A protein has these predicted regions:
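A hydrophobic C-terminal alpha-helical subdomain
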Residues: 67-84, 88, 130-141
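Active-site helix of classical SDR
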Residues: 13-16
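Active-site loop immediately N-terminal to the catalytic Tyr-X3-Lys motif
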Residues: 2-9
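Proline-centered helix-kink/hinge sites
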Residues: 5, 40-41, 86, 123
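Functional cleft and adjacent loop/helix regions within the main domain
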Residues: 103, 108-109, 122-141
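C-terminal beta-strand-loop-alpha-helix "lid" module of Rossmann-like NAD(P)-dependent dehydrogenases
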Residues: 26, 30-80
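Core catalytic loop region at the nicotinamide-binding pocket of NAD(P)H-dependent oxidoreductases
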Residues: 35, 74-120
């Protein structure tokens, strides 16, 4: 899982779902219930559009974040970059859940595999530096 600036609460909720999925998988196994965690990438929906709109409402010239507003906008728009069509996502998800032994973890959609792989492979300091640069946090304010 890749944690990014300006999405702390969102990333925390994804981490919570990850932990809950792991616990439920173990707890429900004796009952024959299988738990599959889905980690979607960019999916064509109104989520990113709404996030961009909300971000604009919070960024004002009086905000301490004003100097790095473009980084905030970039994060809010991140899911708009080559999103997977929702019909393709739904088709692939349905196919996965219909397996006799569905995967424990399913990553679907643009960026769903590459971004977590980067987070896993890159040294933490290098990843932090890249994210700070990408979102305009590499200079003192």
């Amino acid at each position: 899982m890749l944690v990014t600036p300006f999405a702390g609460a969102y990333c925390a909720s994804k981490a919570a779902v990850h932990a809950l999925s792991d616990a439920l998988r173990l707890e429900l196994a004796p009952f024959g219930v299988q738990v599959m965690e889905v980690q979607p990438g960019a999916i064509a929906s109104s989520f990113a559009k709404n996030a961009s709109h909300e971000a604009e409402q919070l960024i004002s010239e009086q905000s301490p974040w004003w100097p790095i507003r473009e980084g905030i906008r970039a994060r809010a728009r991140a899911s708009l970059d080559s999103p997977t069509p929702v019909t393709e996502f739904a088709r692939d998800l349905l196919k996965a859940v219909q397996h006799t032994r569905p995967p424990r973890l399913l990553r679907l959609g643009n960026g769903s595999r590459l971004l977590p792989l980067m987070a896993w492979l890159l040294p933490k300091g290098l990843l932090d530096m890249a994210l700070r640069k990408r979102f305009g946090l590499n200079a003192d304010l």
